[in-house]
């Protein structure tokens, strides 16, 4: 299971800055005013091949009322959700009563917490660490979140004991030249292909799992939120091993009231991260709603292969079906690489075809290709459509290699790669998808510019070059003097 890390602390200790630093985004609001984070925010992050989910929370002071009280509830709930807690304190401001209150709460909950002394820039880190020793949370790890100082030491303390993703290890060695494309080790022999069934509440996820399994393994009731936790169900079909991850439906934030249902959100996000393929279930009778797009977007951001299942297709009139198909084409244009199935989980119509799409999406996500193959595709694409000119110079792309899997990451090396427009990146992405016959999985293109070996080096002349330069300068001076004399 992908670990969950929560950032907690009193207001304005740098939690949102740390969130942005670790997730490499600017999703969290950052400022000098306390209370800018009003709700839990989830982010997808990784460190040295180890993926995790990060939760940013509002500050806790212990004397909250009104909106601040709701914010504190969100922070305490994040502590319950998390596997690890990063307890941030302000090294400049020193220890406060709010810090002591949070430390006491963490001890009562028996949570694995690491004390983080933030904002240690321009102050003595050892003195700052000693000031917080009365909290009884062990030695504080000094960091400067705004500058990135101490982040590696912090993440080593949190995630250093967790094994690297086997996919990352498999990519450490490239496919040998001339070798055929091979599958990168992904699912274990025990679990098989892990499939997360996700979607809004009451779209028929548990009914679909039961239909695909052929037995009643998950509680099904016509009421949203019947499944309160993610359920892992191993099974075998046609000699292939699978593990279903059935999740609670994710509701809009404003509709989440019960505490147990709030916990289900992080379970769904964990299931997406833990899966190899996501079956995204939608209600055909309700069509495409904004919350579907948000949930689908998280699956794509996590890089998961996707199969879309439009449930409750039976009983719909032809005109209604045509309208839904038009809406799918219009609103799901960003995931046009995913197979779409029109099914009835209740009656079993079209359900059996999902397995073929799951297999195809999984193989597309974890297959690796030799550098020679990826480079040849790049050269063929350039011969058809060259990169644009920048300041009169043509962008040069030299070679490509595989940099990751699930999703496939193709790293392209060249010059002026930071000037490549998005339209050309989409062209290359579509070319790789078409030639490699990839379905169901997103593709990521990453560029690396060529390093100038002489950058930063002073051009020092040898003694021989210095003498030659002097002779040339002397010759030029004599020649110039002769030309001036002739003019006279």
Swiss-Prot record:
InterPro entries according to UniProt: G_ENGA, GTP-bd, GTPase_Der, KH_dom-like, KH_dom-like_a/b, P-loop_NTPase, Small_GTP-bd
Amino-acid positions noted as binding GTP 2 in the UniProt annotation, renumbered to this chain: 199-206, 246-250, 311-314
Similarity annotation: Belongs to the TRAFAC class TrmE-Era-EngA-EngB-Septin-like GTPase superfamily. EngA (Der) GTPase family.
Basic residues compositional bias, start-end: 467-488
Residue stretches making up the KH-like domain: 367-451
Segments of this protein annotated with the region Disordered: 449-488
Function in brief: GTPase that plays an essential role in the late steps of ribosome biogenesis.
Regions that span the bilayer: none
NCBIfam families attached to this UniProt entry: GTPase_EngA, small_GTP
Subunit record text: Associates with the 50S ribosomal subunit.
Protein name: GTPase Der
Domain EngA-type G span(s) in chain numbering: 3-166, 193-366
Gene3D superfamilies assigned: 3.30.300.20, P-loop containing nucleotide triphosphate hydrolases (3.40.50.300)
One Pfam family it belongs to: KH_dom-like
Keywords linked to the UniProt accession: GTP-binding, Nucleotide-binding, Repeat, Ribosome biogenesis
Biased composition (Basic and acidic residues): 449-461
Organism lineage string: Bacteria, Pseudomonadati, Pseudomonadota, Gammaproteobacteria, Pseudomonadales
GO biological process: ribosome biogenesis
CDD domains registered for this protein in UniProt: EngA1, EngA2
A molecular-function term among this protein's GO annotations: ribosome binding
């Amino acid at each position: 299971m992908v670990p969950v890390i929560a950032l907690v602390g009193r207001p304005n200790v740098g939690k949102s800055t740390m969130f942005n630093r670790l997730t490499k985004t600017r999703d969290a609001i950052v400022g000098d005013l306390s209370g800018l984070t009003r709700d839990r925010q989830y982010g997808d992050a990784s460190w040295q091949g180890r993926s995790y989910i990060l939760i940013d929370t509002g500050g806790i002071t212990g004397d909250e009322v009104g909106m601040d009280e709701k914010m504190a509830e969100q922070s305490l709930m994040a502590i319950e959700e998390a596997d690890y807690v990063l307890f941030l304190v302000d090294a400049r401001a020193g220890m406060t009563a709010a810090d002591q209150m949070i430390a006491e709460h963490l001890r009562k909950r028996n949570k694995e917490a690491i004390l983080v002394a933030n904002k240690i820039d321009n102050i003595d880190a050892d003195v700052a660490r000693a000031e917080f020793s009365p909290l009884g949370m062990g030695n504080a790890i000094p960091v400067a979140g705004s500058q990135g100082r101490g982040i590696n030491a912090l993440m080593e303390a949190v995630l250093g004991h967790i094994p690297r993703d086997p996919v990352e290890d498999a990519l450490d060695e490239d496919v040998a030249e001339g070798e055929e494309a091979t599958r990168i080790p992904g699912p274990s022999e025990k679990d098989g292909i892990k499939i997360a069934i996700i979607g809004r509440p009451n779209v028929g996820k548990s009914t679909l799992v039961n239909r695909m399994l052929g037995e009643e393994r998950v509680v099904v009731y016509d009421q949203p939120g019947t499944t309160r936790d993610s359920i892992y169900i191993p099974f075998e079909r046609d000699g292939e091993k699978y593990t279903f991850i059935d999740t609670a439906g994710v509701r809009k934030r404003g509709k989440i009231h019960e505490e147990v249902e709030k916990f289900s959100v992080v379970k769904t996000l964990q299931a997406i991260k833990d899966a190899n393929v996501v079956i995204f279930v939608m209600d055909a009778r309700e069509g495409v709603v904004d919350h579907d797009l948000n949930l689908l977007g998280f699956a794509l951001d996590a890089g998961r292969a996707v199969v879309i299942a439009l449930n409750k297709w039976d009983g719909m009139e032809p005109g209604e079906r045509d309208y839904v198909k038009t809406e799918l084409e219009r609103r799901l244009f960003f995931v046009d690489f995913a197979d779409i199935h029109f099914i009835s989980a209740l009656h079993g119509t079209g359900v059996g075809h999902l397995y073929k799409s799951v297999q195809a999406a999984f193989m597309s996500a974890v297959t690796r290709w030799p550098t020679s193959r990826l480079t040849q595709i790049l050269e063929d694409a350039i011969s058809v459509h060259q990169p644009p000119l920048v300041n009169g110079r043509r962008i040069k792309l030299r070679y490509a290699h595989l940099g990751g899997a699930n999703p496939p990451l193709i790293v392209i090396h060249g010059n002026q790669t930071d000037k490549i427009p998005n339209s050309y990146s989409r062209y290359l992405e579509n070319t790789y998808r078409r030639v490699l016959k990839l379905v169901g999985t997103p593709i990521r293109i990453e560029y690396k510019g060529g390093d100038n070996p002489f950058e930063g080096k002073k051009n020092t002349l040898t003694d021989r070059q210095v003498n030659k330069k002097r002779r040339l300068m002397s010759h030029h001076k004599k020649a110039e003097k002769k030309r001036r004399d002739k003019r006279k």
